[in-house]
Amino acid sequence: MSLETFKHSEALTFGVELELQLVNRHDYDLAPFAPDLLRALKGAEHAGDIKPEISPSMIEISTGICHTYQQALEELTVMRDLMVAASRSLNLGIAGGGTHPFQQWADRTISDSPRYQYISELYGYLAKQFTVFGQHVHIGCPSADESLFLLHAIGRYVPHFVALAASSPYVQGVDTGFASARLNSVAAFPMSGRAPFLLTWDAFTAYFEKMRNTGVIESMKDFYWDIRPKPEFGTIEVRVMDTPLTVQRACDIAAYIQMLARYLLLSRPFMPQEDDYLVYTFNRFQACRFGLEGEYVHPNELTRMPIADHILSICDALVPHAEALGSLEALANIRALAERRDGDAEWLRQVDADARSQRETVRKACDRWAA
């Protein structure tokens, strides 16, 4: 399959995708309820989409094309409320979070679709281990070349996105010590990591064709990059976030990405360069391991500061962009979170410490999602 033509989209529109956990109300383990929930929701009126994912123990909700933070918040809230109402008759719980705290990957099944069965055959047990839950945000780009500029410019802020959304401290019943352990599962795939440093669509097309000719990839879906262009939508897709525990936080983070994109496209505070990636993996690891307390190394100035402080350092520059986009509330929420440094991973650990039961932690995560 050749690379699709980069579709025209309205610049700075955005869309949000959230992968959610489906658990039974008996022991709060993951359970394959997606087909039942989708049947229960058939005919329900809502914007956006609700659809199955790689495992029937997870489900994805996504907005339509959004112009404002408030629009995304309303669309996701409606879908959340419909799903929570439908789940009651199924004795089903729905939760955010990047990983389920104690599920065993060997117990998972793969959804019966050609794409997911292909992934299972190709990647073996990695497909079942990929029962992790992420937030993806699409940002509309004014042109194909601008999409690559934005992809690499916003890459500096990947540690922000990871740390703000981090909600996966537990894997198979064990506290990993990470704020976001989910990204370690993604890293096992061969086409993960960062996109190649290319700033023109012609150069990117040539790269894609070389990769396709090797037989390693067939389409853009085979790249599991942290940020990837989506030519069929005319967007870039930011893919590093855990699914937060609430719709509110998911929308705050999406709006933060949108306002950063506006700042980068209009103000051009720097030009992306290959050397930006010298500290990319280190900064990303720090965000995964320590969350907002992680260390951020500036790729040009070589200064060091906590990720939370780096977020706070950019907030003032984002005020006019947040105001223009109608997302000052979201910026205030992001600023407050960075000041407190108490994200979803910290909340999960505190609940688990108080309850001394991961089942109770999942139950409370379900309540938090529904609230």
UniProtKB/Swiss-Prot annotation:
GO terms for biological process, alphabetical: modified amino acid biosynthetic process
Gene3D superfamilies for the chain: 3.30.590.20
GO molecular function, one term: ATP binding
InterPro entries: GCL_type2/YbdK_subfam, GCS2, Gln_synth/guanido_kin_cat_dom, YbdK
Catalytic activity of the protein: L-cysteine + L-glutamate + ATP = gamma-L-glutamyl-L-cysteine + ADP + phosphate + H(+)
The keyword ATP-binding is assigned to this record: yes
Record keywords: ATP-binding, Ligase, Nucleotide-binding
Domain of life where this protein originates: Bacteria
HAMAP family reported for this sequence: Glu_cys_ligase_2 (MF_01609)
Family of the protein in this entry: Belongs to the glutamate--cysteine ligase type 2 family. YbdK subfamily.
Name of this chain's protein: Putative glutamate--cysteine ligase 2
